[in-house]
Amino acid sequence: MASQTTLLLPLLRRELVPICLRSWATDVLKTSACAYSHHPTTLVGSSLRRIVHQRPFSAQTIYLNQKRDFSSTLQRRFASDSDSFDPSRIERESDSVDVCIVGGGPAGLAAAIRLKKIANEAGNEDFRVILLEKAGEIGDHIVSGNVLEPSAMNELFPDWLSEDNPSRFEHATPAKSDRMRFLTKKHAIPIPCPPQMNNHGNYIISLSQLCKWLGERAEEVGVELYPGFAASEVLYEADGSVKGVATNDLGIGRDGKPKDSFERGMEFHARATLLAEGCHGSLTKQVIRKFDLRRDSQPQTYGLGLKEVWEIQPEKFRKGEILHTMGYPLPKDAYGGSFLYHFGDNMVSLGLVVGLDYPNPWLSPYGEFQKLKHHPLIKSVLEGGKCISYGARALIEGGFQSIPKCAFPGGALIGDSAGFMNVPKVKGTHTAMRSGMLAAEAAYSALANTDSGSVFLYDYEDGLRNSTIWKELKEVRNMRPSFSTPLGIYGGIVYSGIEAYIFRGKMPWTLKHHSTDPDSTKAASECEKIEYPKPDGVISFDILTSVSLTGTNHEEDQPVHLQVKDWDKHAEECYPKYQGVENRFCPAGVYEYVEDPSKKLGVRFQINAQNCIHCKTCDIKVPTQDINWQTPQGGEGPKYYLT
């Protein structure tokens, strides 16, 4: 979707803003519900700084005298307009910090907060921790179920829910009941809830809201938050260790040439870099390849989670009720299930998770989600209500046997970048936060004992293996892969029940993930074609209507961030065999094949990058593995609400 033209308030990078003024500006900006624009630069003094927040409210400009010295403070250099434009010839500004964290989800924020707390308690208040987040605001790109197991939160903030805490988190709904159902097309059959899914003592939340709250707490302890900064490149020392990251260049047109607004990205040099990008992060992929971190682990497998938030009729609301289902609408050869959580005031979170190792290229996770809502059990709750939010995100399902090496020279993987999702438990936030806290402790210890240079976080790897993360993931390691064995879905249910109730992970074997998700995809000619019913516009919706609820926004005149080297070659290799699988696995209508008589196949492959909601499914599932998801301009993408 094209960016909207607005009147801008230039605000500088947060580290340059006095705290009193930052607080005032933030309060003013939060009152605006308008979509923000994405002009990339603002000029202060003699240096060009990237805008972090840009929201309309008045025609005034704030002038600030405070600024930090950078290792390179450059005058504006206009890029050459020649065909041979090479941005790497233009020097980037850089800033040196102690720890750089990429990603403002629960893992990254927990790591940042824990680091600064440790440093502050040690009297080392000059210890710099920065966190880069590609979304325009913390929480904007976060989507999750979410029933929170509060163990890590209780440790990080013991009073996070206390009535005596004026800054307490106010949006947690205590879980009251658990139900599990196996769905047929018309019926819902009660089945036992596995012990891992017992939610007594847990809380139904919006993870997006929780991350916003954690962001505020992070600033209070001195973390430097940079939302709107999209890290796009890993930087290396001469010895090959990671020395930080760089943000992407701005002001490059779709044709690859610089515009008048061109600005080079910025480098952040750090002695330790923690990657907290979530599932299948673009920098995480680079680091895993560079250091061969998967050499001793099995292939990762993924799922796609789709979620809507509905406001329902008060008489149908059951605060704290939790429902999970298996079976319909998914076919027998597709792993997955749905959830329905009653939270807040007359709100429900409804979602479907589909394992991306499904074989049938005719299957559409979005289409299956819309079918789910017409099941009598679900429809009876939604009728008379209103869908107010939609989102989708890939998630890790590989479990214990797919965890890579998590430490590398100069940094570590934390949260879903490493893959700590507990699939049978349907939870990953507590493990993500726990991993971030463990990495923070290891990083501070390593840096405190080394005067210079990058570090290796040996203590982090050891800490993981001695943590509750390792214990609980090892216990359930055989459940998810059991559904991909000759046992099938019903055999997988029985086997998982035996593991859950009797063996509890003590079996001497570990089941394997035998292939990757793209390799699991069969040719369209080998599979039954699936026709999806037309949405009614009341309970079910067409995909563009749903995308409009995400608030996603990308400037059109920029290079496509969904990188396909040769679009025609991709179509020739993919379309005849898979018949447009990209259009069906994408939950945002980004990919399509358009009739075009001038093309050899009679169709043209098209990428509608403006629709992208940053779910990463294309990078994971495409059988030809030639779609490379990269970060667009900072601040772009979805602006999720209550997800």
Regions found by a protein language model. Give the residues of each.
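N-terminal FAD cofactor-binding segment of flavoenzymes
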Residues: 126, 134-185
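FAD-binding beta-loop-beta segment adjacent to the flavin cofactor pocket
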Residues: 393-423, 546-557, 571-585
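Iron-sulfur cluster-binding cysteine motifs and their immediate structural context
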Residues: 576-639
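Predominantly flavin-linked oxidoreductase catalytic cores and closely associated redox partners
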Residues: 217-380, 438
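Active-site-proximal substrate-binding core of FAD-dependent oxidoreductases
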Residues: 419, 423-425, 441-488, 601, ...
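N-terminal Rossmann-like FAD-binding beta1-loop-alpha1 element of flavoenzymes
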Residues: 98-130
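A short, basic/flexible loop-to-alpha-helix module at the beginning of a structural domain
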Residues: 80-96, 121, 256-265
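N-terminal mitochondrial targeting presequence
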Residues: 1-87
